[in-house]
Amino acid sequence: MQVDKSTLIQYRMKRSSETLDEAKLAAENDRLLLAANRIYYSAFYAVSALGIKNDFITTKHGQLLGWFNQNFVKSELVEKRFGEFYRNAFQMRQRSDYDDFVEFDKESIDEKFKLASEFIDKISKLL
């Protein structure tokens, strides 16, 4: 099924918003590993929407992260803190999904959730 770029961007941003809502619910229910996963994916969907807008499409998470840092963080289109957040969220998701005996504290997850919300707002403005 072929869809136009605008529709796909809107869809990815909708996924981003829904995934952030899932992160909030997970955190409220002390499912902190799940919250970490959903925080990362909320950012990932937003950056993938930005990639689509800029004709950069990849299925590789690391490539998307590198592209974002090169084109938006280093060029100062977004604040460095957002690049750090996205990288940290990626690492946090990796740890929560693949490592054993990983734990996150509620404060850390709440802080990342707040940053994710700000990050998604910033990405929306770039679209």
Give the predicted meaning of each segment.
Residues 1-127:
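Terminal alpha-helical segments
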